[in-house]
């Protein structure tokens, strides 16, 4: 069993490429998808401007109000069902879920978040409807893998205390699911070829080397590298950070294209 995360730019620009790669992959697979660029498009269609905030660490992320949460859930559902439709139409058995379905991924709403305002000053604001993942129902997800070839998961968690879906980070969803099912491999496929150091792709890192390297690379990628090291420590055999834009992206990554952390 492997877990594959495809980033929003891959979803927008190279989805067919990834679907063809899923069709070629012979084993069971969990596919976690992003879709931020498409969410922004639909937000604008609904007459609103998407809102982004920047953390003190320099990480830019979507701010999700109640109105934007509705658009986020609708858009992610559309992406999810489009992927499932294509997989089934081309011969794979597949099911599409969010973390809300069956309470498969439980989260908690971020009550407050710290941001940098337009003057570069730290400020605490209401957290909106973004969340942090608390638990994954590994038994439920594993039971689904016995029924289908591919599970497609949207990055939406369930906050049972506030009875609301939550926008959760797609990488976090993939890491947590991979840890829960003890995946043989976790693939993070985006629009970069791997972890870059001095303009060259780093081919292989131990978890210790990954933690050390994370201090030398930019925000965003450093978070992926740290989460990759944590995943390996918690039972995932290896994490591969690579490109979803290359031909047969999944098998290419498994064959050594990208950065492997193990």
UniProtKB/Swiss-Prot annotation:
Q: Which GO terms describe its molecular function?
A: acetylglutamate kinase activity; ATP binding; N2-acetyl-L-aminoadipate kinase activity
What is the reaction catalyzed?
Answer: [amino-group carrier protein]-C-terminal-N-(1,4-dicarboxybutan-1-yl)-L-glutamine + ATP = [amino-group carrier protein]-C-terminal-N-(1-carboxy-5-phosphooxy-5-oxopentan-1-yl)-L-glutamine + ADP; [amino-group carrier protein]-C-terminal-gamma-(L-glutamyl)-L-glutamate + ATP = [amino-group carrier protein]-C-terminal-gamma-(5-phospho-L-glutamyl)-L-glutamate + ADP
What compartments host this protein?
Cytoplasm
Coarse class of the primary localization is: cytoplasm
Entry's Gene Ontology cellular component terms:
cytoplasm
Could you tell me which pathway this protein works in?
A: Amino-acid biosynthesis; L-lysine biosynthesis via AAA pathway; L-lysine from L-alpha-aminoadipate (Thermus route): step 2/5; Amino-acid biosynthesis; L-arginine biosynthesis
Q: Which GO terms describe its biological process?
A: arginine biosynthetic process via ornithine; L-arginine biosynthetic process; lysine biosynthetic process via aminoadipic acid
Q: Has keyword Kinase?
A: yes
Q: Where is this site: Transition state stabilizer?
A: 5, 224
Q: Which UniProt keywords apply?
A: Amino-acid biosynthesis, Arginine biosynthesis, ATP-binding, Cytoplasm, Kinase, Lysine biosynthesis, Nucleotide-binding, Transferase
Looking at the record's lineage, which domain of life comes first? Answer: Archaea
What EC number is given for this enzyme?
2.7.2.17, 2.7.2.19
**Residues holding substrate:** 35-36, 62, 167
Functional description taken from the UniProt entry? Involved in both the arginine and lysine biosynthetic pathways. Phosphorylates the LysW-bound precursors glutamate (for arginine biosynthesis), respectively alpha-aminoadipate (for lysine biosynthesis).
Which family is annotated?
A: Belongs to the acetylglutamate kinase family. LysZ subfamily.
Q: Provide the protein name.
A: [LysW]-aminoadipate/[LysW]-glutamate kinase
The gene designation is: lysZ
